[in-house]
Regions:
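Bacterial N-terminal signal peptides that target proteins for export
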Residues: 1-7
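Cleavable N-terminal signal peptides
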Residues: 7-8, 18
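Sec/Tat signal peptide C-region and signal peptidase I cleavage site
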Residues: 14-20
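Subset-of-secretome marker
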Residues: 21-141
Length: 141
C-alpha cells in the first residue's frame, strides 16, 4: 500500500506538469515526504524517500501520450506562476469511477502539494487525502 501511495505522490508531484509547461522543478536529488489519510487506515501513513530527478524525468516535452493512461481524462485547472492545479478522471475496473484533484506549488528547490481522490465502485466510495513536501537536497550521485 505504501508503494502505491508513493507512486501516486510521484505522479502528482512530477509527472502531472505534462499537462502544461508545468511549474519550476530543478533536477537533482530530492527528499519527498508524503502523508496519506484514508478512512480504512487506522492512522495517516507517512513515508519519506529520496529520488534522483534527472533532466530527462523532468523534461515534460519528452513525455508522450503513451506515458498517460488513455482511458483517463486529464485537465489543467490552473497554472499561475509557481502553482498549478489539475484533475484526473478515470474509469475503475469493474465499472467504477475515480476522480482526483491536485495542487502543487514549487519554487524550483522545494515543492508542496495536496490532493483528494475519490473512487466509487459497486456502491462503495473510498476517499483519500494526500499531502507532500519535498526539497532538493543536492546533486544526484
Amino acid at each position: 500500500m505504501k508503494n502505491k501511495m508513493f507512486a501516486i505522490a510521484m505522479l502528482a508531484t512530477f509527472a502531472a506538469p505534462a499537462l502544461a509547461d508545468g511549474i519550476p522543478v530543478e533536477p537533482g536529488l530530492w527528499s519527498i515526504t508524503t502523508t496519506v489519510n484514508m478512512p480504512m487506515m487506522p492512522a495517516p501513513q507517512t513515508m519519506t524517500v529520496e529520488e534522483c530527478m534527472t533532466d530527462e524525468i523532468l523534461d515534460m516535452e519528452d513525455m508522450s501520450d503513451d506515458d498517460l493512461d488513455p482511458n483517463c481524462d486529464y485537465a489543467l485547472d490552473q497554472l499561475d506562476g509557481n502553482t498549478m492545479a489539475w484533475s484526473i478522471d478515470c474509469p475503475v475496473e469493474g465499472g467504477g469511477q475515480m476522480h482526483a484533484e491536485w495542487t502543487a506549488t514549487s519554487n524550483g528547490d522545494s515543492v508542496e502539494g495536496e490532493g483528494k481522490m475519490t473512487m466509487s465502485m459497486q456502491g462503495q466510495t473510498m476517499n483519500m487525502d494526500m499531502s507532500w513536501v519535498g526539497e532538493r537536497i543536492g546533486a544526484c550521485d
